[in-house]
């Protein structure tokens, strides 16, 4: 749907839920409209209210997306374990939900948790979309967290090659990985490139000044 229709969708779904409170689709579309408006609290409330009306007859595609977005929202609010539970539910309904697999794997890697599981989930995403820079970056970062630096370099280089938007995160990861592979000059070069895109990043400034990887 078009962005300008979001408020109309919210109003329609609110009315429809009064007449048919057991229809999961109304909670889904209302939640997604709130999400598109960046109204995350209202979106999360809509999704939480909708959980109770999910049945075995519900659309796996919709329910999977339902839990995926819910997981993203919960993680943004710092509710890590609730987010992981939502991602688990998402993957029960659709085991090959690539977006969920990537986000779940990346968040686990950032926390340094369940790295073997994260690697398995992330590998599915790069198998499905081998030129997706975001997915390649996630996989590279998981290998980095596993101290598999030479392997991680292979995938971060693929991520950098396919990164059409020149993400500061991917570029910074490239610098981190290069540094742990012993390539200090290229590490500093990538950190400097990342800083151009994210000039307020104090950790990047320290990395460049010290010419050293700093764990966050």
List each language-model region with its residue ranges:
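TPR alpha-solenoid repeat register
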Residues: 26, 60, 66, 100, ...
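Short coil turns that delineate tetratricopeptide repeat
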Residues: 21, 55, 95, 130, ...
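Residue-level recognition of tetratricopeptide repeat
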Residues: 32, 72, 106-107, 141, ...
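Canonical tetratricopeptide repeat
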Residues: 29, 62, 69, 103, ...
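Position-specific recognition of the canonical hydrophobic site in helix A of tetratricopeptide repeat
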Residues: 1, 35, 68, 75, ...
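Residue-level detector of the short coil/turn that links helix A to helix B
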Residues: 4, 38, 78, 112-113, ...
């Amino acid at each position: 749907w078009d962005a300008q229709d979001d408020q109309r969708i919210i109003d329609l779904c609110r009315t429809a839920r009064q007449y048919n409170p057991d229809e999961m689709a109304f909670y889904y579309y209302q939640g997604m409209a709130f999400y598109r408006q960046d109204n995350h609290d209202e979106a999360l409330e809509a999704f939480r209210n909708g959980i109770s009306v999910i049945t075995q007859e519900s659309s796996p595609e919709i329910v999977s997306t339902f839990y995926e977005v819910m997981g993203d929202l919960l993680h943004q609010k710092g509710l890590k374990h609730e987010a992981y539970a939502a991602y688990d539910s998402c993957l029960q309904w659709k085991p090959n939900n690539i977006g969920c697999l990537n986000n779940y794997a990346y968040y686990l890697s950032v926390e340094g948790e369940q790295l073997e599981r994260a690697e398995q989930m992330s590998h599915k995403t790069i198998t499905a979309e081998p030129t997706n820079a975001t997915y390649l970056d996630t996989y590279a970062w998981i290998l980095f967290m596993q101290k598999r630096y030479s392997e991680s370099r292979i995938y971060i280089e693929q991520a950098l090659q396919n990164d059409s938007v020149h993400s500061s995160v991917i570029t910074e990861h490239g610098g981190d990985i290069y540094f742990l592979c012993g390539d200090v000059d290229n590490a500093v070069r990538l950190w400097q490139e990342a800083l151009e895109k994210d000039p307020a990043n104090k950790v990047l400034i320290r990395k460049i000044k010290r010419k050293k990887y700093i764990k966050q």
